[in-house]
Amino acid sequence: VKIRHKPLRTLVSTAVLGVLATGALHAGGFSLYTEGAGYTTGNFAAGVAAEAADASTGWYNPAGLVLIRDQQAVFAGVGVFPTAKLSGVSTYSMINPPPAQSLIYSEVFNNINGAEDAFVPSFHYALPLGENATFGLSVVSPFGLATDWGPDSPVRYQATFTELITTNISPEIGGRLTEHVALGAGLDLQYARVKYNRILGAPHIMNALALNPMLADSLTYNKGHSFGVGFHVGVLGMFNDNHTRLGVNYQSEMRHEFYGYSRLTGPLAVPGNIFAPTFPQLGVFQSDDLFSNAIDLPDVVTISAYHDVNEKFALLGSLVYTAWSSFKTVQLTNVAAPRFATPPPLSVVGNFSQVKAISVSPQNYTDTLRVAIGANYHVNDKLMLRVGGGYDPTPTNDIDRDVRLPDTDRWALSAGAHYQATNNIGVDIGYTHLFTSSDPVINRTDALTATTSYNVTASGTAGANLVGVQATWTIDKEPPAPTK
């Protein structure tokens, strides 16, 4: 086997910078399963652990690398264009025991938008190591989330801007065990960055004083980083002269513990009294030792099948089990926050100072099973068409679901194409439309203190369009020998 090494360091550096610079948006919880390559948007990633279409098989099932017999680089990206609109009512309540007066402030809203467009790039590389083994390298973003409701929105006390970006670098190896069985494994080195913001305020008090309810609003900005290590392993069965393939891939759970800082900006960031004539005075209070609990991103099991019906037509399918039940809560410690003094004496009424607080957000996700089916049709030697679709249930529940991720069950329809432009360059395009089986529903209550709570009750519309593009460079492929 002739191997001509290309500037791999340059290819990988470019790919890593691309993924690090990207925002991401949720798909199926906040999994970016379909976005691991570009061509997968053309069939909703049906059969992805068995097809071994290109070097991206190193991520979806590294055993499939044995079928990549030429050095290859894949550059891909998926544009995510979502819809997330909510209508409902938010209620900030202070329920005091009699004879004290209870204070309630409500806002009614209609079709507020929290969706954020995103671009998710990926890079894959394959290098044959003799006749029976292939090395691979994948740079992907397996999980991501971005919603932005804005600091003035009616749901600001639950969330404003939320972002999760992950970058996963995986060296992989696939080897043929027998004529019909191949094994593969990859090491997952994953960097994650999170932003988890909201507004803290006292709209119930300001409203009772006939003042602007937003007068005390202060932004708590929380940012953290984490690094985790995991793995993925796969097996591929090849039968019927390789026209029938069965693949299984296991992606391990990834544990993250985020460390960073928390910054409170606004009137509640400096000591004062909300009844003082000088209120509000703007300030900044920062906590530099913010950290989270151990957050376990789920392990994933993919079972895929691929079958060539004839020389032009192939069928594909996948079952993807995601163990979301590992994601139970998000707890941030040392969050920059205000603390109001509790009387008696009455002289302290309205006084507030700054503290490093603990913020707990229950999630209690449940495991999900995603289904995808698809087909390939070879029009000629240069053009292949793809279609697919499937069902992807939400892991969220009706009690803990909040506006950071207004998720619901969804169906998918996909179409795409591969065009072999030259002997060495192939181009893929794909499109997936995600539409919901029911409207997303929010009915979340956050306990802020022993007597104060914040509730958002809403329903709305959700969906997304995914547009994938991919260029596959087969670096070492020799041109076909002339026939004359």
Where are these predicted regions, by residue range?
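Gram-negative bacterial Sec-dependent N-terminal signal peptides
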Residues: K2-H26
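Outer-membrane beta-barrel porins/channels
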Residues: G28-F44, V48, L86, I95-Q101, ...
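Single transmembrane alpha-helix segments in multi-pass membrane proteins
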Residues: N43-L65
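Short strand-turn segments of transmembrane beta-barrel domains in outer membranes
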Residues: A46-V48, Q72-F81
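Short active-site-proximal "capping" loops at secondary-structure junctions
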Residues: G64, G79-T83, A185
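Short glycine/proline- and acidic residue-enriched helix-loop micro-motifs
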Residues: L103-V108
